[in-house]
Amino acid sequence: MKETDREAVATAVQRVAGMLQRPDQLDKVEQYRRREARKKASVEARLKAAIQSQLDGVRTGLSQLHNALNDVKDIQQSLADVSKDWRQSINTIESLKDVKDAVVQHSQLAAAVENLKNIFSVPEIVRETQDLIEQGALLQAHRKLMDLECSRDGLMYEQYRMDSGNTRDMTLIHGYFGSTQGLSDELAKQLWMVLQRSLVTVRRDPTLLVSVVRIIEREEKIDRRILDRKKQTGFVPPGRPKNWKEKMFTILERTVTTRIEGTQADTRESDKMWLVRHLEIIRKYVLDDLIVAKNLMVQCFPPHYEIFKNLLNMYHQALSTRMQDLASEDLEANEIVSLLTWVLNTYTSTEMMRNVELAPEVDVGTLEPLLSPHVVSELLDTYMSTLTSNIIAWLRKALETDKKDWVKETEPEADQDGYYQTTLPAIVFQMFEQNLQVAAQISEDLKTKVLVLCLQQMNSFLSRYKDEAQLYKEEHLRNRQHPHCYVQYMIAIINNCQTFKESIVSLKRKYLKNEVEEGVSPSQPSMDGILDAIAKEGCSGLLEEVFLDLEQHLNELMTKKWLLGSNAVDIICVTVEDYFNDFAKIKKPYKKRMTAEAHRRVVVEYLRAVMQKRISFRSPEERKEGAEKMVREAEQLRFLFRKLASGFGEDVDGYCDTIVAVAEVIKLTDPSLLYLEVSTLVSKYPDIRDDHIGALLAVRGDASRDMKQTIMETLEQGPAQASPSYVPLFKDIVVPSLNVAKLLK
């Protein structure tokens, strides 16, 4: 208390100090005192009121507790009186057991009386129900069946209530109504038959289907009522619950499965297109059935049955099972394509599930895949493996067929521009196109894989093609009379290389997206290289053919016979031009290279004739005559190859200029200028060697040994550097060593 008083005094002092901060506030002390007195009186009044209220509550509570105590005592006394009365009336209650039994018996008899009419008429109702079922009057039959079951179930329930352990009476009642279960089963069979043909029935007689649904719905209500009573009494009549709604969906599901499986009319042995036909029948049947279900069947079923949704799921599951079964068979490559195209594309297309007549109830996005990704992957792997084997076999067969054409006695066909060709490129790329078009129907990814496969196999195929072309050339060289049209078919082989190149580019442009092109492009340089090699070998073989015919005339060059008036170069020009009339059938890129190579080789052979020292001029007159003949023949060759190279837009004079330059060395009349002339020759043609110079001087026939030695030693000190565009002519010309040794002596 003292502590509280001290705190109150301290608080008061603090409040007074807060009020009297300035001198002028002392004048208001009396005013402050009265205000605080009023506050104190107000607080004390509220405090007294609160205390009084608490006291009143305590007083009321004590009064109520006192009343409750009195009530408890009264209840205690009443319970004692009841207990006393109960003990006194036990004997009286036991004497009323007979009354209780009589009441139960009365209840049973009342139920029996109530069902008496039905009990006596059971056989008649059974016959009528059977007749109605046979007549197809299903609703009336079900009404009578319900009456029979109601009578049976009512009697059995009363017996169960009276004596649940009395199985004899229960069996007696059940036996008396024994035909009821048979009628129920017979009616169920009729219902299931209607449901199995529901898609037909709903179009011909929708009322019948509605009757079936009404019967099932009635049975569902009875099942629910009986199950509710079971929770209270434990009694369930025989044959309940029937679960006809669940059985209805089971029947529909089995019907859908049978319908899907029954669409396969053919086998692989009887029809190669069995799977395509099977899948098309499935597509048509499923689409028609779902349209009927959406437009007609939904009108015959209660909304909560969700009949269309359930049928859609049934068809989807049945299709998935069927596709799994088909996928597990040993399918051929074309059959795998047909299956995957149908599963991945057709099924979700407007031809089937996206059909406008099924919208908006069918949402393709919510449907699970018909085949799992694992199965699809396995099928694709099998397809790629089979396709690889097939492509290898097809390419091998195509090449063998083409090889047979190479030995024919007739010329190959020409394209619209007159270039020789065989059917090989067309056959190969037609086969590639077909497989790529098929793969594109399945997916972009598979199309890319097939394209990569085709290009890979094309690479291997071109290597075999190159080997076969080489063998073809070698066999011809062993017997130049066979094959008869060797030149024409070799031209066709060369042209095929260009066709292959163009077809590869076209194929990639058509079937390859830009973003994946980089992954496939590395095969292109390899194939281009092989094709160029094949064409180069082919051109080389054709030129070999030319130079075999020219060999005799080339050997006449730079000989006494040549100097005396041989027409070898005339024959060479005529022969080359004649061959190039055939070579006009070669496509431009390769013909251009071939013309340049023929020009180079003719000039090289001419220079080789010079370097082989077939002639040694004995006088300035002979040197002049020989040199002038060389210049004339160089011009003759220049004219020929200008004619052959017309349209190529290239300078063809350089090679023949070499012959003229060599002729100038031979023609020189002042031996003192020989070193200068030779130096000029070497600077123009850096690949010329000292043995070439020695042979050239030997052909002149007037160079002394010292002059030869001086020229060669001087040239060895400062070899000329070749320009990047220079095409070597002398490096392949071999000078007989015996001749060089003699010259140096």
Swiss-Prot record:
Expressed in epididymis (at protein level). It is found in: Cytoplasm; Cytoplasm, Perinuclear region; Cell projection, Growth cone; Midbody. The lineage of its organism: Eukaryota, Metazoa, Chordata, Craniata, Vertebrata. Coiled coil: none annotated. The exocyst complex is composed of EXOC1, EXOC2, EXOC3, EXOC4, EXOC5, EXOC6, EXOC7 and EXOC8. Interacts with EXOC3L1. Interacts with BIRC6/bruce. Interacts with MYRIP. Interacts with SLC6A9. Pfam families: Sec6. This is Exocyst complex component 3. The modification N6-acetyllysine is found at residue 28. It comes from Homo sapiens. Belongs to the SEC6 family. Its main location: cytoplasm. InterPro entries: EXOC3/Sec6, EXOC3/Sec6_C. GO terms for cellular component: cytosol; exocyst; Golgi apparatus; growth cone; midbody; perinuclear region of cytoplasm; secretory granule membrane. One of its GO terms (molecular function) is cadherin binding. GO terms for biological process: exocyst localization; exocytosis; membrane fission; mitotic cytokinesis; protein transport; vesicle docking involved in exocytosis; vesicle tethering involved in exocytosis. Keywords: Acetylation, Cell projection, Cytoplasm, Exocytosis, Golgi apparatus, Protein transport, Transport. Component of the exocyst complex involved in the docking of exocytic vesicles with fusion sites on the plasma membrane.
